[in-house]
């Protein structure tokens, strides 16, 4: 599989590709082999200023575009993504290290579907009216909030960009968006698609390190809203920056989700759900089912079979269609995951699968870690409480329904979770009792457009992938109309 991309990428400002104002650039590498992929512009404060100015000017006309026409724009974007699906999937795979089977079948088509979903939602959007009395009519309408600053992460660069761009454009907002400096290429390639579809300045893409270009976005007074996906630590900085200017922020942050398996679960479905919960996207998923709770009556058998399945997972070069687990994002993430393996041992848990880096052959050049299963863990261990963000799960034994609910909720986070059981009443009870924004029943990591996604507690604020997010990108306006031709009667007008 050969990749065809530019050697050098600029910033997309006002529908033009431009270099950074000071000429600064940074390199982008393939995490699977360490090879350089491209060079990207490092946006300066002046560049962000220009991008915001372009978005501000474009907003004057974009906000007046009809719902019908905005929906048509979104559909054109979706069709263009489909037309370039194979190319975009390759770019995402080389840039991020995730298997091509995931980018081709999940990331890219799901991104396109989000544009289609919001096009449909937009056509169905209505205001409301209320008659207070025979002479007073109240109209409620929603208007776009303005210029939005968006920052997307490295784990799902293309998909997270689609999650944020689609509702913002549907609402009538204009955007300045920044990808992670580790994974800038798929959004830049999307920029070339948007450049041919959208009016100038509606979407502007600035690239660079979060500590510089990202901070310029957080601090810029020209934004009416911020949207961020990433760690809870950085999310707090985003929230603080927004609060200091009294603007709203949508935050999708960290997680340490519980994946719960009762003794009556469908056996193969349960094993598959445990693997899907922690190995999809190399476990670099904010809602990964990294805490696996298994009922004591099936614990030993479940652990024995799951560990064998972990060992059978094909770790390979991400562009190989048979690869099931690809590369982690960069060297520091490898070291972080392996440090938790050692910590688990120190805390008294056992490693029954994986727990090591692949150092030989082609994979030795990249950031590959074998699927890792930690057993005999307890919920108070650091490995069960801290977000690791890799293909590593801890398995915790439980006895009763009440016990597992209490332990699952004993977490700073509340983003995702799963429950596997053939008892429908139990499934609903547990799903309702877990303090989390998304619960899966007898499945995991399904993220369709139209299903609201977001977190409780320190996992974020707001919901994405659902029409409710349009409320985050709009403001409510109320218009009171007097239908009478008579004065108020409060004053003597004669």
Protein language model features and the residues they cover:
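Hydrophobic face of amphipathic alpha-helices that form TPR/SEL1-like repeat modules
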Residues: 1-32, 356
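Conserved C-terminal structural/oligomerization subdomain of aldehyde/semialdehyde dehydrogenase
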Residues: 33-39, 260, 314, 364-494
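Structural signal for hydrophobic packing residues in well-ordered secondary-structure cores
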Residues: 59, 63, 78-85, 89, ...
């Amino acid at each position: 599989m050969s990749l065809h991309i530019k050697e050098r990428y600029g910033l997309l400002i006002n529908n033009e590709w431009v270099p950074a104002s000071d000429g600064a650039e940074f390199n982008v590498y393939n995490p699977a082999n360490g090879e350089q992929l491209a060079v990207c512009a490092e946006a300066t404060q002046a560049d962000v200023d220009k991008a915001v100015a372009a978005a501000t000017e474009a907003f004057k006309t974009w906000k007046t575009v009809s719902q019908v026409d905005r929906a048509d724009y979104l559909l054109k974007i979706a069709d263009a993504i489909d037309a370039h699906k194979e190319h975009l999937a390759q770019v995402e795979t080389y840039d991020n290290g995730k298997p091509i089977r995931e980018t081709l079948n999940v990331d890219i088509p799901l991104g396109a579907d989000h544009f289609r979903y919001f096009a449909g939602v937009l056509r169905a959007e209505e205001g409301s009216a209320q008659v207070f009395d025979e002479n007073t009519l109240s109209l409620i309408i929603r208007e776009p909030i303005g210029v939005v600053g968006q920052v997307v992460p490295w784990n799902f660069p293309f998909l997270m960009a689609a999650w944020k761009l689609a509702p913002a454009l549907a609402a009538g907002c204009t955007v300045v968006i920044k990808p992670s400096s580790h994974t800038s290429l798929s959004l830049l390639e999307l920029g070339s698609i948007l450049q041919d579809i959208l009016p100038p300045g509606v979407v502007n893409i600035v690239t660079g390190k979060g500590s510089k270009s990202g901070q310029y976005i957080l601090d810029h007074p020209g934004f009416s809203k911020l949207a961020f996906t990433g760690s809870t630590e950085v999310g707090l900085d985003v929230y603080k920056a927004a609060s200091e200017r009294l603007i709203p922020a949508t935050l999708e942050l960290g997680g340490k989700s519980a994946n719960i398996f009762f003794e009556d679960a469908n056996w193969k479905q349960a094993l598959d759900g445990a693997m899907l919960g922690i190995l999809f996207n190399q476990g670099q998923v904010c809602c990964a089912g990294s805490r696996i709770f298994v009922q004591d009556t099936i614990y030993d058998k479940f652990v024995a079979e799951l560990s064998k399945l972990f060992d059978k997972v094909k770790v390979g070069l991400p562009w190989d269609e048979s690869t099931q687990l690809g590369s982690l994002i960069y060297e520091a993430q490898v070291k972080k995951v392996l440090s938790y393996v050692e910590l688990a041992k120190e805390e008294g848990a056992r490693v029954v699968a994986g727990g090591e880096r692949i150092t030989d052959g082609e994979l030795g050049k990249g950031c590959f870690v074998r699927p890792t299963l930690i057993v005999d863990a307890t919920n108070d261990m650091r490995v069960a409480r801290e977000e690791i963000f890799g293909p590593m799960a801890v398995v915790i034994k439980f006895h009763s329904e009440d016990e597992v609910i209490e332990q699952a909720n004993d977490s700073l986070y509340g983003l995702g979770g799963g429950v596997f059981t053939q008892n429908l009443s139990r499934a609903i009870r547990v799903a309702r009792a877990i303090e989390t924004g998304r619960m899966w029943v007898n499945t995991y990591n399904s993220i369709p457009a139209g299903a609201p996604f977001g977190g409780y507690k320190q996992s974020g604020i707001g919901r994405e992938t659902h029409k409710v997010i349009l409320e985050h990108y709009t403001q409510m306006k109320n218009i009171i109309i007097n239908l009478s031709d008579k004065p108020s009667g409060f004053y003597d007008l004669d």
